[in-house]
Amino acid sequence: MRTLILTLFVLLFVPSLFAQEQRVGIDPAIIEAYPEPNVEPLYPQDNMLYDRVYRRVNNPLQMFDNPNGSIVQDMGKGFNFVTLAGVSQPEWEQVTTDRWMRTTDLSEEVTISRFGGVFFPENPLPYQMAWTLRHLRASSTPGADENPDNEFMYRYTRVNLYTSVEVDGKLWYQIGVNKWVHQFDVARPLPVERPEGINTEKWVSVDLYEQSVIAYEGTRPVFATLISSGLAEWPTNEGLFNVYFRRERTLMSGAEGLPDFYYLEEVPWTMFFDDDIALHGTYWHDGFGYRRSHGCVNMSITDSNWLYRWSSDVRDFNNPDSVDIAVYVYSSGTYD
């Protein structure tokens, strides 16, 4: 009798439970119909990425007027980068400030990020797109460990987010058939309604939670990418701003004599919008999608160049009342 009851239980209930498990997520046919985001990538241009040679300063920042000459700048250790001028002598390199540094004080050539954002189609995407923020293999079910049988996905892979399930207070997104990732492993560019107070046709939104930027023409999002905004101790301020000053290349330096001293030569495609906080290109890291700056909005050189040129016609310099592009900084969520 016990054997019969157990057999009936297995026949009646186990298939039902299995079917419920199989129903987690959307129909595989839908995933097959929309396998990846319908966006156009912005490809990097080698002649723009590699037109300069950047080096990190390993030792205290000391610059000389000539090889074996006198010290004309001595600012100590920090997060310091210089650009080589292409002129060298044994054990010495000239930098763009027309000064010289010892070769032993400089690192090897900096590796430039090749990351680029995407252009949105005219019609809204059927599913929210996202970028993966680390190398990973997706889990087979929400909340599970990575499945070694799932294909390896590189950081910055573009994926569709088909649906989500909450596990222990956090979202897990379905990115394929039996493929799920934790919300912290992806960044989503989330279009927002045009805020009141935006005073330019072209404008950008900066989402500090998702670490993304979206460029708009009117109410339509046209371009999106990943950023790195200010760390908690040097936050990027929320609010509505306008770019007030722009430069194709500029020196950025601050906190001299303090532990967070930095000196960055030739920061590319720079647009200041909040005091000394700017949107700008970044040659010294490839960690987009995470906060890591001194307050500025770091972008790849590819993305910052596009944004700079796309917005260059916003301000009419023949009209004294004209302003440069509006920048809306907000947060779509709260950091834990």
Question: For the regions a protein language model found, what residue spans apply to each?
Answer:
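SH3/SH3-like beta-barrel superfamily modules
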Residues: 22, 69-107, 151-187
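Bacterial N-terminal signal peptides
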Residues: 6-16
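Positively charged n-region of N-terminal signal peptides that target proteins for export
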Residues: 1-4
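Short, solvent-exposed interaction modules
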Residues: 117-163
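Cell wall/extracellular polymer interaction/catalysis modules
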Residues: 145-237
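Exported/periplasmic cell-wall-interacting domains
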Residues: 197-199, 223, 231, 235-240, ...
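N-terminal post-signal-peptidase region of extra-cytosolic proteins
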Residues: 65-70, 79-80, 189-201, 225-230, ...
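Boundary regions of SH3-family modules and the immediately adjacent low-complexity/disordered segments
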Residues: 20-51, 96-129, 174-203, 234
